[in-house]
Amino acid sequence: MDIKRTILIVALAIVTYVGVLKWNQDYGQAAMPTQNVAASTTAPGIPDTAAGTNGSASADVPSASATANTAAAPLETPAVASKDLIHVKTDVLDLAIDPVGGDVVQLRLPLYPRRQDRPDVPFQLFDNGGERTFLAQSGLTGTNGPDARAAGRPVYTSTQKTYQLADGQDTMVVDLKFSENGVNYIKRFTFKRGLYDLVMTYVVDNQSAQPWAGNLFAQLKRDASSDPSSTTATGTATYLGAALWTAAEPYKKVSMKDIDKGQIKETVQGGWVAWLQHYFVTAWIPDHNATNAVQTRKDSQGNYIIGFTSPTLSVAPGAQGETSATLYAGPKSQAVLKELSPGLELTVDYGFLWFIAQPIFWLLQHIHAILGNWGWSIIVLTMLIKGLFFPLSAASYKSMARMRAVAPKLALLKEQHGDDRQKMSQAMMELYKKEKINPLGGCLPILVQMPVFLSLYWVLLESVEMRQAPWILWITDLSIKDPFFILPIIMGATMFIQQRLNPTPPDPMQAKVMKMMPIIFTFFFLWFPAGLVLYWVVNNTLSIAQQAYITRKIEAATKKAAA
């Protein structure tokens, strides 16, 4: 039975490590006068191809339901960004808007430094033409949409080139204007203090003699560059790719490989489209009451696009109409994302053990609210988990202590039966039955802790709250590996001590394998997040104390009975 236990431990170690690696592979300005509104909407069709227009920009513009007034254009025309960007800064966002099309082409997060040693350099989420391509685009396409013009995307004007949320100001509105053929357009961005979501609204003021019709589109465009927010240590890559909401699947991942295979089209009511990376998410959220056409595609420049097209907005002559969507660009904060749209909080992906990980994060968050330090919070969480499993662990350690106590009898059986494994195995089972020992009892703590261990791994890896979270001394970031490998070495030492408390396998080969386990696990844990290794160190330390106490108690009782 000892060989089964050895095989189980080795198998769990290998499965854990390989499972982590496999997961990683699947993932690496002034307002217009208010007028009477006379507008209606109809559902959009899902386009079969991307449509653009001649001129500067329109390979980026998706086609809506084709009409005689919709200008088809070459697909190969790349977007050309304006050098004269409009800069907007709030307390949590620092972004730039391109007047050509009104796209958000740059975005930084001032509260999230790119590196811990450079707190003055904010993490850059969007970039266009720098190190990579990642931006949020939106516009009006369809019959009369200005983004479907043969002349290219509209060039907006603004009253200022720089906007900043002032002290004491809670809301800031940035209006971009464009007029053509008697129709006045306002592309309005509304920012609020402390929020990473902004509302983008199109106001269509139709002063022409003809009805106006168009569709709002919003999309995220990204190249295939690596994730700048992800750690690079072995075993810590996370999912980089798109995702969307459907009624049947509230969180549907769409990887770059999926987009390479062909367009994905869905018709959904409400929903959202998003691009995920480590710790951060960007999402377009349309009107939750509207039926929207969601689509993914790959443009001729090799960029990946996921977006939606809203129902047709119709505006009568002399009337005004509005259509809007919300853009979120910021950290994966579950509470915030859940309020924005159903299912969006699932972008904090805890894997197949999410039902264990979610309560762990909830408890960890509440402990942190009291202690104010994630490292100490992990220690307290470990103590609570250990207390929860105390009865089960105690039963297991009692079984192991009894096996340790009968070790001399097992050695005697080995001498009696020699190399006759069948008789040896039969004699061992009779001895275990006589002594009321469960030979597999020592495996229970490992089996029970593995789901908790894996769940905590994803909590530490996926939760933005852990990003750059310090503990003490040299541990300045619990979400990445220990820079000096001190915690993994301590963990290996605790495993060695635990091993000394366990019964020695009667087979010499098994004994050698067991002696190698602390070294093997130490190697595995070298690149694991420091917070996870901290959990394992504390758990092992508590286990040693519990097991040593039970072992001494049973050995004393055994000696007393023998006297």
From Swiss-Prot:
Presence of keyword Cell membrane: yes
GO biological process assignments: protein insertion into membrane; protein transport
Alphabetized UniProt keyword annotations: Cell inner membrane, Cell membrane, Chaperone, Membrane, Protein transport, Transmembrane, Transmembrane helix, Transport
InterPro entries: Membr_insert_YidC (IPR019998), Membr_insert_YidC_N (IPR028053), YidC/ALB3/OXA1/COX18 (IPR001708), YidC/Oxa/ALB_C (IPR028055), YidC_ALB_C (IPR047196), YidC_periplasmic_sf (IPR038221)
GO cellular component annotations of the record: plasma membrane
Transmembrane stretches, start-end: 1-21, 344-364, 370-390, 440-460, 471-491, 518-538
Annotated compartments: Cell inner membrane
Pfam families, alphabetized: 60KD_IMP, YidC_periplas
Domain of life: Bacteria
Segments of this protein annotated with the region Disordered: 43-62
A GO MF term: membrane insertase activity
Membrane topology: Multi-pass membrane protein
Assigned protein family: Belongs to the OXA1/ALB3/YidC family. Type 1 subfamily.
Role played: Required for the insertion and/or proper folding and/or complex formation of integral membrane proteins into the membrane. Involved in integration of membrane proteins that insert both dependently and independently of the Sec translocase complex, as well as at least some lipoproteins. Aids folding of multispanning membrane proteins.
PANTHER family: CYTOCHROME C OXIDASE ASSEMBLY PROTEIN COX18, MITOCHONDRIAL, OXA1
Subunit structure: Interacts with the Sec translocase complex via SecD. Specifically interacts with transmembrane segments of nascent integral membrane proteins during membrane integration.
Name of protein: Membrane protein insertase YidC
